[in-house]
Amino acid sequence: MAMSLRVVVPPHPLIGHWLTMLRHRETPPALYATALQELGRWLTYEALRDWLPHRREPIPTANGDTEGLVVESRAPLLAMPVMPGGLELWQGGRQVLPEASLCLNGVPDSIETNAGLVIFIDQITDGHAV
């Protein structure tokens, strides 16, 4: 897995919906928290679409043999929420990445070469501040 910074802005209607809930000034606190979690889940799903390591594997089914996709669990995944809102985004993201290691104090000093790092941050940045 190559190390690179990628910004993904998926044109998904559910992402647009939850982003609208976050931006609306009259959104109640409980709905705001739900919107952050849902946005975290959908953005994580979309960000991993072409990035999550996987392999094709033959599998037996009731109708005969076929080929399926299996996620490679050998590549460690790290999740780093930037406080405070990043933790709420991670609450949604962990539904997609339940096996990811949580990094609450920044990136560990030593990580494996093939490790993937997903940063959960609730701010828009110019790319130089991350």
What positions do the PLM features span?
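PRPP-associated nucleotide enzymes
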Residues: 1-130
